[in-house]
Swiss-Prot record:
Keywords: Cytoplasm, Cytoskeleton. This is Mitotic-spindle organizing protein 1. InterPro entries: MZT1. PANTHER family: MITOTIC-SPINDLE ORGANIZING PROTEIN 1. It is found in: Cytoplasm, Cytoskeleton, Microtubule organizing center, Centrosome; Cytoplasm, Cytoskeleton, Spindle. The gene is mzt1. It holds the Pfam family MOZART1. Required for gamma-tubulin complex recruitment to the centrosome. Transmembrane segments: none annotated. One of its GO terms (cellular component) is gamma-tubulin ring complex.
Amino acid sequence: MASNAASLNAVRETMDVLFEISRILNTGLDMETLSICVRLCEQGINPEALSSVIKELRKATEALKAAENMTG
């Protein structure tokens, strides 16, 4: 039981550090999104490909918002 608590604490600390790095680098990722990205990388997803997908999704979101503002 103590081992599980220690492992959970280590994971939380690691995620806190990763989130701080993410914030310093101004990635715009929230803790939940960062956690999903970490899990995907742990499962073998290429981090560079994941980064490209995130950038493309952000561009598409911005384009949709711009289109809504023009028609809305």
